[in-house]
Amino acid sequence: MSTFPKRILLKLSGETLIGNQGFGIQQQACLQITKSIQQIQQLGIQLGIVIGGGNIFRGINLKANGMPRVPADHMGMLATLLNGIALQQALISLEVKTCVMSALDCPKVAESYQWSKALQYLEEGVVVIFVGGTGNPYFTTDTAAALRASEIQANLLLKATKVDGIYNQDPLKNTQAVKYDRISYSQVLAEKLQVMDATAIALCRNHQIPIFVFNMKRLFENRLDHVLTDYSHGTLVDDGEIGHEANKLDR
């Protein structure tokens, strides 16, 4: 691409904050990620971030063990608040202007999400970290990312994952899985490709927000700018070419 998007929504899983400790939040991992975020901000790009909470808690796990879905999801949403605060403090240590806006009211630790205020912050160059998911149970943080991207009129949604794009099968389980360079929203939905849930994909399609799926390792290599200049580093989801396949995994 010849120019950078004006405004980006970056979706991070809670797992990006684990580092090498297997659970929770590792400060070094936070600092490495925030260096990539700082790099993007220095390009003049307005940046919003939605972060998951799976490194701390997954509501769906408690539901499987008998807890009602609603309180289980509330606990998962609160986990994203912890991650957001950790990310905010790491950004502050790099002197990056940032704020945490929560879909759940926790006024002593985060601002309540307000659409107009979020837009104002973005225009002022503040990195806005959106936590609390959508504020409602039964919705994933991927859906929250698509919702916030739609609300702030993001030009691109970046999703960091464990693999370097979208494959026709799980590449962590099948070494013959084939990667797509580019694929349409409709094909992702039709083939039920497990990159984001269907609600999130449909929201992005309805609001014409391209999705770029890339390997979270780029965040730790300070190479997020490469992702924005060369789409071969992942998979682009939009209404363009129907997915053509890239090379098989070299393993």
Curated annotation (Swiss-Prot):
Sorted UniProt keywords: Allosteric enzyme, ATP-binding, Cytoplasm, Kinase, Nucleotide-binding, Pyrimidine biosynthesis, Transferase
Binding of UMP, residues: 53, 73, 134-141
Disulfide bonds: none
One function term, GO molecular function aspect: ATP binding
Compartments in which it is found: Cytoplasm
Binding sites annotated in the UniProt record for ATP: 11-14, 54, 58, 161, 167, 170
Entry's Gene Ontology BP terms: 'de novo' CTP biosynthetic process; UDP biosynthetic process
Regulation: Allosterically activated by GTP. Inhibited by UTP.
Subunit record text: Homohexamer.
Protein name in the entry: Uridylate kinase
Highest classification ranks of the organism: Bacteria, Pseudomonadati, Chlamydiota, Chlamydiia, Parachlamydiales
Gene this protein is translated from: pyrH
